[in-house]
Amino acid sequence: MAQSVVVLEKDPGVARSLAGGLHPHFSVHLTGSREELHESVLRDRPEAVVLNIEYWRLTDVESLHHDFPKLPIVCTHRIPDEEMWMAALEAGAADVCPSDDVGNVLTSVLRSTAMSRTAAA
């Protein structure tokens, strides 16, 4: 089975862009709600989650991290700043990237999944 990533993104254009950038490396499952994300994580056991904190709350990151502590969470936002980055990290995110910088998101997911596998070994 191919490694998978679940993406929670409300904007269809950004979702397609992220899926296109992640697809060469991962099987990508797009979700549009917190409930669908949670179900997908339980069902598919992805290597990482990409979640846009512009539309979803940091408490969603905290809850996801609490429920799945070994699952890397990469957050995105149109215009992330240092304060938001720090708050997301404190909530359990592995990183925060601009949502339109697909290369940065891919690098962060690859790095986070590699670190997660190393920690599990």
Feature map (PLM): residue ranges:
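Two-component/phosphorelay signaling modules centered on CheY-like receiver
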Residues: D11-G32, E36
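Conserved acidic segment of CheY-like receiver
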Residues: A2-G13, L18, V49
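Short acidic active-site motifs
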Residues: E36-S40, T59-D60, M84, V105
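Short amphipathic alpha-helix used as the core "switch/output" element in two-component signaling
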Residues: L58-K70
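Alpha4 helix (beta4-alpha4-beta5 surface) of REC/receiver domains from two-component response regulators
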Residues: H77-V96
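Two-component signal transduction core modules
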Residues: V49, I73, V96-C97
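Receiver (REC) domain switch/output surface
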Residues: D101, V105-A121
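Acidic, metal-coordinating helix/loop segments flanking the phosphotransfer/catalytic sites
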Residues: G32-A48, W56
